[in-house]
Design a protein with these regions (language model features):
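Shared catalytic-loop signature of beta/alpha-barrel
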Residues: 1-87
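C-terminal extensions of enzymes
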Residues: 74-113
Length: 113
């Protein structure tokens, strides 16, 4: 109502997950405010979740701020994300289309002191 923003940017983690992000996108759309989704740095799973949620709304501007998959040398998912061309084809698999690599989860788990 106050016309205090033309565009809103947030990441799924900041929003509180996919359901909360969907609600925020709907609220922004109702206020005629465009949305940019991105996290600056994240791994494959969070990046794919943001890509998938961004693809569900015409109110989300094209392009995500997601450089994590371009900069990491390893990931905890079995699938890789190639966004080096600036675009990708959405998966037809269930959920976000990724599975976790249990051995990588063990390898990178924070060890208790």
């Amino acid at each position: 109502k106050a016309d205090c923003a033309d565009i809103v940017k947030f990441g799924l983690t900041q929003a509180g997950g996919m359901t909360a992000a969907s609600r925020m996108i709907a609220s922004a759309e109702a206020a005629n405010v465009k949305v940019v989704i991105g996290h600056g740095f994240g791994l494959n799973l969070s990046t794919m979740a943001e890509i998938m949620i961004g693809a569900t709304s015409n109110n989300v501007l094209p392009g995500l701020e997601c450089v994590g998959p371009l900069k990491v040398t390893d990931t905890v998912t079995n699938e890789q994300i190639d966004i080096s061309s600036g675009e990708m084809t959405l998966t037809e698999k269930i959920g976000v289309g990724m599975t976790l690599d249990e051995s990588k989860l063990s390898k990178y788990a924070l060890k208790t002191l």
